[in-house]
């Protein structure tokens, strides 16, 4: 057990046994740590299935998060969401006894993958096209249920080898119209004086725009992010988008997201798809990239788009 400032992490190999239901989970590794808890990759002992398990630093805070996830489940059942992909938000809720304390935890489904930053470092920044589209699909589904993710940042986005995205750590998920429960400053539009912290689709789209800037133009973002609050503004972000070559393929989308001009997440997803298709066509026309490599990337993109289409519309 590692403890720092009342926060702790459990090492790989630790077995977490639920006090009430008795399920046993073997910790594989740490997936992420936020303001209100830690998320682990775990293996259920009886089935060997992998899940994401979150433990909370504060019982009341985590219970509030669990209540939001349960509300998501109820809303999804009421709407009658269908599809082949399992989109369950909760697998199990229980307590873990540690050093005389009861630590609440919940278990969620897990998609094997890497954090977004690590994925792009391995595969290349071009794969943001695929992962970004999948992320917008995830957000569109969440927004359609009446909720905003809130704490959208690279650490909370896992990407499978084929670019499929899974959101982890739902600590910031908030019902639309209410205040965002949890956020990270750099990705918060209030931090940039670009709007309030009301939970709504445009809040997540703004956050994703800053995530893109962070991943593709980190140095200039760091420079303006550390400035004085009274001088920091949305205009700084727009200037980076307009001035950095790495962001030009996404310029139109990023500007609209930062300005809050998308009418819906579906519209944002559609524009993202259009800009990806445009990039593919341009590369086919002039890129020296080997044909086999371009074909592999294009095929992966098409397969993902088809899979996502049938998942959400069947």
Feature locations, PLM:
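ATP-binding glycine-rich loop module of kinase domains
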Residues: 24, 28, 35-67
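Conserved short submotifs of the Hanks-type protein kinase catalytic core
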Residues: 100-115
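Catalytic-loop of the protein kinase fold
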Residues: 139-160
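C-terminal single-pass membrane-anchor helix
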Residues: 278-314
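Short beta-strand micro-motifs within the conserved protein kinase catalytic domain, predominantly
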Residues: 80-104
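Juxta-kinase regulatory segment immediately upstream of eukaryotic protein kinase catalytic domains
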Residues: 1-20
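C-lobe/activation-segment region of protein kinase-like
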Residues: 171-240, 249-251
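Activation segment signature within eukaryotic-like protein kinase domains
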Residues: 131-132
């Amino acid at each position: 057990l590692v403890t720092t400032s009342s926060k702790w992490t459990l090492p790989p190999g630790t077995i977490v046994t639920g006090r009430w239901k008795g399920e046993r989970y073997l910790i594989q590794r740490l997936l992420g740590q936020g303001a209100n808890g830690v998320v682990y990759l775990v293996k259920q002992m009886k089935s060997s299935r992998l899940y994401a398990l979150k433990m909370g630093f504060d019982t009341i805070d985590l219970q509030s998060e669990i209540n939001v996830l349960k509300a998501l489940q109820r809303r999804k059942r009421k709407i009658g969401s269908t599809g082949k992909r399992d989109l369950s938000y909760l697998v199990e809720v229980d307590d873990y006894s540690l050093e005389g304390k009861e630590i609440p935890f919940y278990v969620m489904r897990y998609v094997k993958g890497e954090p977004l930053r690590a994925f792009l470092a391995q595969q290349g920044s071009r794969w943001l096209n695929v992962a970004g589209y999948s992320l917008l699909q995830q957000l569109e589904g969440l927004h359609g249920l009446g909720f905003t993710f809130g704490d959208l940042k690279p650490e909370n986005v896992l990407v499978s080898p084929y670019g499929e995205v899974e959101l982890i750590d739902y600590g910031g998920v908030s019902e639309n119209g209410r205040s965002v429960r949890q956020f990270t400053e750099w990705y918060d539009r209030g931090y940039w004086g670009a709007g309030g912290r009301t939970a709504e689709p445009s809040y997540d789209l703004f956050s994703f725009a800053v995530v893109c800037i962070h991943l593709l133009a980190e140095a200039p973002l760091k420079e303006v992010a550390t400035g004085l609050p009274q001088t920091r503004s949305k205009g700084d972000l727009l200037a980076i988008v307009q001035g950095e070559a790495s962001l030009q393929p996404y310029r139109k989308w990023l500007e609209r997201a930062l300005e809050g001009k998308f009418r819906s997440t579906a519209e944002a997803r559609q524009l993202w798809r259009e800009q990806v298709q445009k990039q593919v066509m341009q590369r086919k026309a002039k890129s020296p990239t080997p044909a086999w490599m371009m074909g592999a990337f294009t095929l992966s993109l098409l397969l993902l788009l088809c899979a996502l289409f049938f998942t959400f519309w069947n």
